Amino acid sequence: MGLPLLHTAMTAAEFLAWDEHQTLRREFVRGEVFAMAGGEDRNNTVAGNLYATLRQHLSGSPCRVYMSDVKLRVEVADCYFYPDVMVTCSTADAASRLIKRDAVLVVEVLSPSTSAYDRGDKFADYRALPSLAEYLLVDVDKRRCDLYRKGVDGLWVLHPTQGEQPLVLASVGLTLAAGALWADLEPEPPDAAAAVA
């Protein structure tokens, strides 16, 4: 996972009671509590761009978008996560102030310390959510997105985008221009081959 283990052998109920009094965010994974890695400003900018676009797009609908301060409960996997961005369209989630359970879209903006975990074990845990239709991994360094979409057969299919390709989020009916996702970032570094020429 790449994050320091803080506590072991804690139940989900104990975690919630303990976490209520903490100032920093921590994730709970099957009895273990892990500190969240701090994010770079570029990651925060991209998460904010996505949040703002989704918020505007979903305005007036039953769906709500949340950023990294809202917990997502994955009951079957016995986990609590703080996704960078998530969307839920559930009336039960709308009634719950602190914890969401029915995300249709989960987004993680990758960092070097969490990339392997976000692509592996965390994705496996998220897939246990019956409501989840899409899982988006955003690589700011490569300006690439790996969108995993669940098919009608229950299998997850990768839909990668890179550069100026639009990002199609079918779960919320949004096609996002690449410029909107990467807005306010420094210009993309020139290609290594072009730099030599």
Regions inferred by a protein language model and the residue ranges of each:
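Gly/Pro/Ser/Thr-rich low-complexity, intrinsically disordered segments predominantly at protein N-termini
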Residues: 1-197
